[in-house]
Amino acid sequence: GYVTADDVEKLLAQQPTDYLLLGQTLVNNGALTNAEFEKALKDYKAENQITDDISDNQTETLHNLINEFYHFDNDENARICTDYVTLLFKNLIRFIGDDFTPMEASVIKNFAAEHIVIQKINGKYNAEACIATDSKTYMAFAERFAKESFTEVDDFVNATAGEFLNVNDGLFVVNESNEHGVELTLTPQKFLENGELALSGTAFCIPVNYPFGKLNFIIAT
């Protein structure tokens, strides 16, 4: 069926990140263009006095630091990788916490872990974004994002970790459209348990250490 104005208001009122999920769903379904979603997002933030945690100046500083630290300039898709990781770190600060330490990145062809969340980005170019970690860290990561406690890794923990990746990737897709005129779509997330991820093209693994454990973020272009 169709999404009504009342449905939109109810969804927007539920949780801080729900308006992002709603917007990305509407874009994926063709109900909104990326430009329309961006306008609606700005209007919603203004009406509800929602502000980004990081200013434009801070974003530029973060962007430059990431580029210098990870040496993405050596990769043919340097701009894409730098923009993606800048957004990722902003969303980690916003949704998970700023108590993390970025570790040196490595170029990989495959990666094995107890839990891997995968989402593909398709369009003018193709990319793959992943979160890989052990069970304890995976559950703690989901707890921070959901602001709930979990006792075991189950479908809800998977859905929560997948929701973080989808929110981040959805915002990345919107930014690519608005800032660079690049139209992209997202595939549904996939989950691997005790598996190994095989990657094509250039793939960077970016470890991030939190007090609760190490998360490995992978971006392949």
Where are these regions (language model features)?
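Non-catalytic accessory regions
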Residues: 1-83, 90-99, 110, 162, ...
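Short, charged low-complexity intrinsically disordered segments located at boundaries
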Residues: 26-28, 55, 117-124, 172-174, ...
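Intrinsically disordered, low-complexity segments enriched in polar/charged residues with Gly/Pro
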Residues: 11-12, 105-107, 193-195
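Short, highly charged low-complexity linear segments
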Residues: 35, 52-58, 149, 184-204, ...
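Generalized protein targeting/export and membrane-interface segments
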Residues: 53-155, 207-221
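Short, hydrophobic/π-rich interface segment
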Residues: 154-203, 210
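A generic "cationic amphipathic patch" detector
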Residues: 39, 105, 181-182
